[in-house]
């Protein structure tokens, strides 16, 4: 069964997101979101992108895109940042609350990224985030490593294909479990 999945690239346009010498979150997220989306499409899913170029949309606009498309799932790709360089490392996935399919999918994504080599910082509730609160479908925000951590950046660059594969396979695996349990 094909699901409609909105894949969102965090930030964009005049909003670079977190920055670190030589990189901007908006660029890393766009590159990763496009590859995750491509892999989801190859897995038979219907993918809608919030952006495919360097443009800015408010979080409200991103949620509206997903709602207008009547998507089944919303996946937002981001990079994390900490107050000090190399202070933290790892991946975490944010969800509105720890319930339902979004929790299973978030845990699967984090576990798959841990296998690639990231530290698993767990699944966190963030009910105040617009893209998690204003979407009418299960929504996740994946923080794919810290942009101001040298080890996370090395992993992001050297294992980019594996990272995109891990995220997409975790999503597809969760959807497969859901479909077979119906």
Model-assigned labels for residue ranges:
Residues 3-4, 27-181:
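Active-site-proximal helix/loop segments of hydrolytic enzymes
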Residues 17-31:
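Glycine- and acidic-residue-enriched helix-capping/strand-helix junction motifs
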Residues 2-20, 75:
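Catalytic-core environment of secreted peptidases
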